[in-house]
Amino acid sequence: MSFQHREIEKKWQDYWLTHKTFATSDSEDKPKFYALDMFPYPSGAGLHVGHPEGYTATDILSRMKRMQGYDVLHPMGWDAFGLPAEQYALDTGNDPAVFTEENINNFRRQIQSLGFSYDWDREINTTDPNYYKWTQWIFLKLYEKGLAYIDEVPVNWCPALGTVLANEEVIDGKSERGGHPVERRPMKQWMLKITAYADRLLEDLEDIDWPESIKDMQRNWIGRSEGAHVHFEIEGHDEQFTVFTTRPDTLFGATYAVLAPEHALVEKITTATQKEAVEAYIKEIQSKSDLERTDLAKTKTGIFTGAYAVNPLNGEKMPIWIADYVLATYGTGAIMAVPAHDERDYEFAKTFDLPIKAVVEGGDIEEEAYTGDGKHINSDFLDGLGKEEAIEKVIAWLEEHQKGEKKVTYRLRDWLFSRQRYWGEPIPIIHWEDGTSSAVSEEDLPLILPKTTEIKPSGTGESPLANIKDWVEVVDPVTGKKGRRETNTMPQWAGSCWYFLRYIDPHNSEELASPEKLKKWLPVDVYIGGAEHAVLHLLYARFWHKFLYDIGVVPTKEPFMKLFNQGMILGENNEKMSKSKGNVVNPDDIVESHGADTLRLYEMFMGPLDASIAWSETGLDGARRFLDRVWRLFTNEDGTISDKVTEQTGGALERSYHETVMKVTDHYEGLRFNTGISQLMVFINDAYKADTLPKEYAEGFVKLLSPIAPHLAEELWNKLGHEGSISYEAWPQYDESKLVDDEVEIVVQLNGKVKAKLTVPADATKEQLEDLAKSDARVKEQLEGKTIRKVIAVPGKLVNIVAN
């Protein structure tokens, strides 16, 4: 007989919502546990089976911690601004707010149907003005501290669409919508100075419990490099440019320089004879993305400007080229080329027949660049020195002659924070006619995103907000000065940078969150989500958190103490699930056919939480069969509690039960849910073999099952005679003394060969073991006619008799 999952699951979901079972307490007398999921973007497609994997993991921890006496904060919300809703609005003419609300309602319904123990009174939505008021407030604080500024940055401009495109909207130099040509064009953009926090973002990784692979991704993204800035004069011009190099010791081997085509000096220094070729080259590369430009496998392209730099060490002339593999947004936008000792420079020099001069001993530069270490040669006062010594000496020379200085740089660039979009948080800045800018006052926040039917490109590179004149154009009531509101909006990252803080105090209209509540709940104890957010989201959230720490808003330096990335659930064919492949599994279908508890159990039992594993209908059926076995063990045909469940204690299941409590608790704590479930299965197998199931063990088992299969557990808990929910019952304890076997199995060897296995008292002495072995019928038979020479007894293990 199987249980009626539709009826039972609806009954308990209604109960939890009505009774606010999972409402968070802010009491001071309990330890706290904050379990956070990466909140979803509410897409039109709805939830897929990949979402519940991480959500079930945090839910298991949350349910267990409540039963262990913790105050648990386990919230859910919506990362609801973003490009898809805007594209939908452009395609249909419908309001993205309405579309978003419909999607959120669908997501909420789906999530509630899976029985997660969220506190729905704390639900947040990044598009709610009461939420983005505080996103705007954080921006104003960054602006006040000089960490938000405007800069000219190359962007993807599509002339045909009259709009700026995100990198993911550009495919092979053309717009995803309509296939129109896209070019790189400099535009004024808001930037956030994340580089000011680079060292702290790097150093504080040591203090948090994150997978080492994720920490390495963050370290590589930040990319700290020690080296030198070298200043190059330009022959015949009163100009100079600066390059950063980690190998200033190879400066004697620098034979040419390369500037990014967008570098500010290119126009000034290009000679008349080269002007046409340089302009043609710049036009040609305008449609290339940064990724295409820096592709190592592509053929090197470039153009000579006609100008020469002067090598500061030896005064030699170095031709200045431009090439697309040097980016204006990376480093200083200029490099010194040492082709003898750098593969990319070598390839470029060979392509354009530029001089190659070896300055480090080793290798054969006729064949390839030598990138190893060695003594310096052809380097004047550096000759004979090793790398480290030569670097120190050349930096000292550069500093003494004011031709350069020691420098630490970062791969990390400041964060481009503006989007030419409608569906995002308005940036609370006004630009005045006299060229000044000022922030919207805090009292006037939130600056509401205006409703409009004109969600179409402005044609000027500004966002569609530029079309709404009565919103954009303002007059200072005091001075009468005219101004225009900032028309760019914030990126989707903005709302997700700090959402975990708002869950702590979601209805506070006076401040981002109360300091007392932030002190109680921070940092987040466990954060579970997909590895695709391992770099940018986590880096941006850490940056904002550190900034808020600096201005006294939050009490911790880091937001997330423990981070875990769940793996991906693949289609049955081991391919990534996607609509185009037709292999997407909808959780609604599984909840209907097998039940939410089955889906939760199956996704946790598939394998390790961080592994990527293929979906299997057979595995899903197996998970349901296990829950049916539990139901049949606990209940009679008429639905009453089984006669097998008795009031007696101890008995045959004693050791199995205590071992199950110990192992399941340990495995849940360690996020090893698959092995925890295996142990639950072991106990059920043992319970079927036993004549009776002590009620104490039945209740303990139901508690252990409840984080995984909460609906079934609630129903069984009621059938065991309890009122209300199991959610706050005490988590089972195990007795270590019950884990020790009274008896153990030992082997008996004759001349080193196993002849028998005996079950003996666990505390038997050597003498007792010897007597037991000698008196065993099989051993006696083997010893007949032999003389015992020696007996070796090892308690708990073996007896070896030497005889001949």
Curated annotation (Swiss-Prot):
Chain ranges for the short sequence motif 'KMSKS' region as given in the UniProt record = 576-580
Which of this chain's residues are annotated to bind ATP?
579
The family database entries (Pfam families) matched by this protein are listed as: Anticodon_1, tRNA-synt_1, tRNA-synt_1_2, tRNA-synt_1g
Reaction equation(s) it catalyzes: tRNA(Leu) + L-leucine + ATP = L-leucyl-tRNA(Leu) + AMP + diphosphate
Q: Which PROSITE patterns match?
A: AA_TRNA_LIGASE_I (PS00178)
Instruction: Enumerate the CDD domains for this protein.
Output: Anticodon_Ia_Leu_BEm, LeuRS_core
One GO BP annotation here? leucyl-tRNA aminoacylation
Q: Which GO terms describe its cellular component?
A: cytosol
Q: Where in the cell is it found?
A: Cytoplasm
Q: What HAMAP family does this protein map onto?
A: Leu_tRNA_synth_B
Identify this protein by name.
Answer: Leucine--tRNA ligase
EC primary class = ligase
Q: Which UniProt keywords apply?
A: Aminoacyl-tRNA synthetase, ATP-binding, Cytoplasm, Ligase, Nucleotide-binding, Protein biosynthesis
In the record, the note on similarity to other proteins reads: Belongs to the class-I aminoacyl-tRNA synthetase family.
Q: Which GO terms describe its molecular function?
A: aminoacyl-tRNA deacylase activity; ATP binding; leucine-tRNA ligase activity
**Record InterPro entries:** aa-tRNA-synth_I_CS (IPR001412), aa-tRNA-synth_Ia (IPR002300), Leu-tRNA-ligase (IPR002302), Leu_tRNA-synth_edit (IPR025709), M/V/L/I-tRNA-synth_anticd-bd (IPR013155), Methionyl/Leucyl_tRNA_Synth (IPR015413), Rossmann-like_a/b/a_fold (IPR014729), tRNAsynth_Ia_anticodon-bd (IPR009080)
Where does the motif 'HIGH' region lie?
40-51
Q: Which EC numbers does the record give?
A: 6.1.1.4
Q: Which PANTHER family match?
A: LEUCINE--TRNA LIGASE, MITOCHONDRIAL, LEUCYL-TRNA SYNTHETASE
